[in-house]
């Protein structure tokens, strides 16, 4: 299977269209969800799963705003992490901690886990600093993300 298709498949696992509380999710995406909840406790993580052109499944075109740009940067960060031997970011778990809204990737992570943890940590911090525009949730990707 094409790696790009694998990434899209993994991203769809968190899509609110088919998500339920008992549906399995790749462990890394579960950790990323928890990081988002650490930095943005007042908004459910699934609000970020289908936002703009880059948050959630795939990504193309010009980001619609700063929050969408956070997701584009996160996608690019995962693409860089994939260059590490045997590193599959959507499935790589890592050690981190959340303390009072502050995320820290722990030192015991291998190169892949450290890279993926940092991608997720930086994205969660970026999400916390970017305004959320309800009009950019669940947009028409074909019309707005060319």
Curated annotation (Swiss-Prot):
It comes from the Eukaryota. The active site is at residues 74, 120. Binds 1 Ca(2+) ion. Expressed by the venom gland. Ca(2+) binds at residues 54, 56, 58, 75. Residues 1-21 form the signal peptide. GO terms for molecular function: calcium ion binding; calcium-dependent phospholipase A2 activity; phospholipid binding; signaling receptor binding; toxin activity. It is an enzyme of class 3 (hydrolase). It catalyses: a 1,2-diacyl-sn-glycero-3-phosphocholine + H2O = a 1-acyl-sn-glycero-3-phosphocholine + a fatty acid + H(+). Belongs to the phospholipase A2 family. Group I subfamily. D49 sub-subfamily. Snake venom phospholipase A2 (PLA2) that inhibits the muscarinic acetylcholine receptors (mAChR/CHRM) with no subtype selectivity. Shows catalytic activity. PLA2 catalyzes the calcium-dependent hydrolysis of the 2-acyl groups in 3-sn-phosphoglycerides. Monomer. This is Neutral phospholipase A2 muscarinic inhibitor. It comes from Naja sputatrix. The lineage of its organism: Eukaryota, Metazoa, Chordata, Craniata, Vertebrata.
């Amino acid at each position: 299977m094409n790696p790009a298709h694998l990434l899209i498949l993994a991203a769809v696992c968190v899509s609110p269209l088919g998500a339920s509380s008992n549906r399995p999710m790749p462990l890394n995406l579960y950790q990323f969800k928890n990081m988002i909840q650490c930095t943005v406790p007042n908004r459910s993580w699934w609000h970020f799963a289908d936002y703009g052109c880059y948050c959630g499944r795939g990504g193309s075109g010009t980001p619609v705003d700063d929050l969408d740009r956070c997701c584009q940067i996160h996608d690019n960060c995962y693409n860089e992490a994939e260059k590490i031997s045997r590193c599959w970011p959507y499935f790589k778990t890592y050690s981190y901690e959340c303390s009072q809204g502050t995320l820290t990737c722990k030192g015991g992570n291998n190169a892949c886990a450290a890279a993926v943890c940092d991608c997720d940590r930086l994205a969660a911090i970026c999400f916390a600093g970017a305004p959320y525009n309800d009009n950019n949730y669940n947009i028409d990707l074909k019309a707005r993300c060319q």
